[in-house]
Each structure stands twice: as structure tokens, then as C-alpha cells.
Regions:
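Extended, subdomain-level signal for the structured scaffold at the beginning of enzyme domains
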Residues: 1-141, 150-153
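A conserved active-site-flanking secondary-structure segment within enzyme catalytic domains
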Residues: 158-165
Length: 165
């Protein structure tokens, strides 16, 4: 896979754009599993899917260049096998079920819509087990905003200082 990019030269008063080419191996494409449950904020879920799916492609589309292969392949993973609605009644159709034990190098826990006195204690035990298994298998686990509450529920933050907003 060949990617064309432009950069500005530092040695001139007025930056000149110079094209260069770099090769990106197709095996660099990474799958990212974004977790969805009914408490997930719909904007966070689909915002992440959109941003991750555009990685490595948006610039080519803007300048009319040939599209390149995707760099990140985001998929929605859920403990629920059927479609459901998440925060603000946004419909979700999971791509993958937790029961299928999917593996990926990246697992993301997006924002949750929880009341200030609400927690996830005892909810989704299979999901919590799966997140721990992914971590133990080498996956990078990321959380956004209140998704850190789900990360804390897994026990992976035990003994660590952590915060959410």
C-alpha cells in the first residue's frame, strides 16, 4: 500500500509543499472493538466508530487522491446478541457478540449514561470477564469519559489511581 502525503519545508519563509510517498503495510490494519451496552452514550459510540473508520482515509478523500486501505477496522461488540437502543434511544446492532470471544489488539469502552449514584456493580459479568481476558491476552484497553467506570468494574484498575469526568 502506497500513501501520498505532503509536508511543509522548514527552511523557507513561505512553506512550500513537497510531496512524499510512504508505504504502509496492509497488515498494519488493526481491528478495534468498541463495547456497547444499553447504558452507552450513542454519540460516543458512533462518534468513535466514525473517527476510527476515517483514520488514514479522510485526507485522501479531501484531496481527491486514491483511497487507501483502512488503518483501523472498528466493530461494535456487545454482551447483547440482538439489536437494542442505547443512550437517547439510539439503535445499536452489534457486529460481534461477547459470547463469540472475539479478540482484537484494541478494545474501547466509551462513555456511559449513568446517574451520579449509579454503578455497574454486578451488571454484565460476562462482559467484565471478556475485557479481563482481552487484557491478559495482550489487548490494549481504552476508556473514554465515564467508560472508566466500566474499566474499574473489571478490576483492572484495582490499586491504581484513576479518575473520570
Amino acid at each position: 500500500l502506497i500513501v501520498r502525503a505532503t509536508c511543509a519545508k522548514k527552511d523557507s519563509f513561505v512553506p512550500k509543499k513537497e510531496a512524499f510517498w510512504m508505504e504502509i503495510p496492509s497488515e498494519a490494519v488493526k481491528e478495534a472493538l468498541v463495547v456497547a451496552v444499553p447504558e452507552t452514550a450513542g454519540s460516543a459510540l458512533y462518534g468513535m466508530i466514525d473517527v476510527l473508520a476515517s483514520a488514514g482515509k479522510l485526507w485522501q478523500e479531501l484531496v481527491g487522491a486514491s483511497p487507501i486501505l483502512e488503518q483501523i477496522s472498528p466493530k461494535i461488540v456487545s454482551p447483547l446478541s440482538d439489536s437494542f437502543v442505547c443512550g437517547n434511544n439510539i439503535p445499536v446492532i452489534p457486529d460481534i457478540k461477547i459470547a463469540d470471544q472475539p479478540q482484537a489488539p484494541i478494545v474501547i469502552l466509551p462513555e456511559l449514561w449513568l446517574a451520579p449514584d449509579e454503578d455497574l456493580n454486578g451488571r454484565y459479568p460476562d462482559l467484565m470477564d471478556w475485557i479481563r481476558q482481552c487484557y491478559q491476552s495482550g489487548s490494549s484497553i481504552y476508556s473514554a469519559c465515564s467508560g472508566s467506570i466500566m474499566l474499574a468494574e473489571t478490576g483492572l484498575l484495582d490499586g491504581c489511581k484513576a479518575t473520570s469526568h
